[in-house]
Structures are given as C-alpha cells and as structure tokens.
Amino acid sequence: MITLEQVTKIYQAANGSVTAVDNVSLEIREGEIFGIIGYSGAGKSTLIRLLNGLEKPTSGRVVVAGRDMTRVKGRELRKARQEIGMIFQHFNLLWSRTVRENIAFPLEIAGVPKEERNKRVDELIELVGLSGREDAYPSQLSGGQKQRVGIARALANNPKVLLCDEATSALDPQTTDAILDLLVDINKRLGLTIVLITHEMHVIRKICDRVAVMESGRIVEQGEVLHVFRNPQQPITKRFVKQLIEPEETEEAISHLFGQYPSGLIAQLTFVGAAAGKPLITEVVRQFAVDVNILQGKISQTHQGAYGVLFVHLDGARDEIDRALDYIQRQQVAVEVIHDAR
C-alpha cells in the first residue's frame, strides 16, 4: 500500500542545510494501522507531508496506493490527494461552517452533485457518532466532537489511506481513547490503511499493529507492537516503553523497598501475549521451594494482545531461586533482576 525507498528530505537554511528525513525505507501494508513515534524534531511531520505530496523528497521514492508521489503532478496529484485523507492535531475546521458544511467541503471541491453529497455527509455523520450535531458550529463542539468532524471530512472522498498527525495530542485521556476506538472501528469497517504519527506510546499500544520509531530523521527500530514492547533494542525505544509500563513513581517505589528485603532478590517480570494469562506465580510456588511476594503489577491491552509487568520478591535457597527464574524464562516471560541481596 505505502512504500518509502531511501527517502531523504533536506531543507536549506540561512546557516546551512537541515536533514529532516534521512534515508528512510518503510513498507506499510494495506489495511493495517501503522504508528510512527518519536519526540519533537524527529522528522515525523515531514514524513507525513511526504506521504501526501505536500513535500517532495530530496531523494528517494514515495509510493502510495500504487502512485509514485515523487512524480505525479497537476490533475494526477490532485486525484492522488483525494485518495489520502488527513486529520490534524488542531482540527483545522472552517469556523463559519456547520458540522454538515465542514464535512461537505471536500465533496464540493471535488464537484460531487448535491444529492450525492448530502447522502455521503449523512453516512459520515452517523459513522463518526455526530447525529444530532450536524447543524452545530465548531465553537459549539467539544474537542472530541471537533476531531470527529475532522475524521468525517477526511473520509468524505472515500480515501484509501488515512494519515493522522498527532490527532489526539490536544485531547484529554478519556476523549483520546474514544477517538482511538473510533479509528479502530473505521479501520475494521472500511478496511482503511491508517498511518498514525504520535509522541505518545499509549496511542501506539492501544490501536497500532506495527510501529516505527524515529530519531533524528531516521527509522531506528520497527516491528509488530508486541514484539517491540517485549524486546526494545534502541535506547529511545526503551525510554518510550519504560514510560508506559514503568513510570518514575513506580521505579522510586520499588527502590524504596530494597531495604525491606535483606535477602532474596527483586525481579521485574514482563509478560507478552498468551503468557500474560498463565497462572505463573502459582506454578512457581508449587514447583520450587521459594517464597514469592508480589510488590506491584500492571497489565495493559495492546491492539495485538496483553502486555504486563510484575515486580516480585523471591526468597529461598540460591539454587531454588535460580531454578525458579529459569522456569519463568522458559514460559516466555522476560526476567530482569532489579536487586539481588543473596
């Protein structure tokens, strides 16, 4: 569906050149929700502008839905952009138009007849859950409702791809989850390919099938979301994952417990997928002469399955603890020893 081949984008500035996207190659499959995550300045927004043809790469190829976006011009470029919907962080609605009129706007530009246009707008209003609000103006809507209008407008021309540029960054957590649920529903109903730009790992965890991590204009890591959560390779990826599963207050709380356990060890157990549903602690206590104390834990659901972290204290003879840890690892659970007082 989307292919980037050795794409580079260099901007010329007064004090020299700036490489915003640096030799990026990427494959995004048809019908998947693909996340691109990175901190500010990583090159994410430039990358999304390359996908919709608002920017041309300095070198490399960008192919979207069979069209080489580096070569198309004029009418063909306008046609290509109609097949690429986009939603924004700050909604970009026309404040003098109602919900209905905002959604109809791209259809007017495309020259769709009025009767067909009205029918399509009605379908979209129902799809995004705005029935009863079609005659309201943007100033009368909540942030979540404004973004629903933005999503409906982006879908007006039946695009093959939906680009989301920090689409939930301006929303509160509850509204963010509602918008993410809507995107998942649209993906399932329409088979739409969604590319999502964000700096929030929560967004990636909740709805994405695969993820690419950007830093300094480069893709430094990519893969299925559960795999990246289970085995992050790059320091930046580890920071993103750690922020989600082990916030600073958790780390401080665990470190304060070290003095309370003068023997045994404290370990972090990471469960992914099917392993998160197994009665692991029960089996460890049954099979080995160790005492297990659960200090803290959390299980989250990703778009692909469960992901959990458990902090435990194990006490007993050294060889029994070692055997227990070996057993845990053989159950496809990652083990990291946080504190060893044996």
Swiss-Prot record:
Assigned GO CC terms: plasma membrane
Binding sites annotated in the UniProt record for ATP: G38, Y39, S40, G41, A42, G43, K44, S45
Pfam families assigned: ABC_tran (PF00005), NIL (PF09383)
Major location category of this protein: membrane
Annotated PROSITE patterns: ABC_TRANSPORTER_1 (PS00211), ABC_TRANSPORTER_2 (PS50893), METN (PS51264)
Topology of the protein relative to the lipid bilayer: Peripheral membrane protein
SMART domains according to UniProt: AAA, NIL
Location of the ABC transporter domain: 2-241
Domain of life: Bacteria
CDD domains, alphabetized: ABC_MetN_methionine_transporter
Protein localization: Cell membrane
Gene Ontology molecular function: any one: ABC-type D-methionine transporter activity
Protein EC: 7.4.2.11
Catalytic activity, as annotated: L-methionine(out) + ATP + H2O = L-methionine(in) + ADP + phosphate + H(+); D-methionine(out) + ATP + H2O = D-methionine(in) + ADP + phosphate + H(+)
Keywords, comma-separated and alphabetical: Amino-acid transport, ATP-binding, Cell membrane, Membrane, Nucleotide-binding, Translocase, Transport
Transmembrane segments: none
InterPro entries reported for this sequence: AAA+_ATPase, ABC_transporter-like_ATP-bd, ABC_transporter-like_CS, ACT-like_dom_sf, MetN_ABC, MetN_ABC_transporter-like, NIL_domain, P-loop_NTPase
Gene3D superfamilies per record: 3.30.70.260, P-loop containing nucleotide triphosphate hydrolases (3.40.50.300)
Subunit organization: The complex is composed of two ATP-binding proteins (MetN), two transmembrane proteins (MetI) and a solute-binding protein (MetQ).
Purpose of the protein: Part of the ABC transporter complex MetNIQ involved in methionine import. Responsible for energy coupling to the transport system.
PANTHER family in UniProt: AMINO ACID IMPORT ATP-BINDING PROTEIN, METHIONINE IMPORT ATP-BINDING PROTEIN METN 2
Family, similarity comment: Belongs to the ABC transporter superfamily. Methionine importer (TC 3.A.1.24) family.
Protein name: Methionine import ATP-binding protein MetN
Source organism: Geobacillus kaustophilus (strain HTA426)
Name of the coding gene: metN
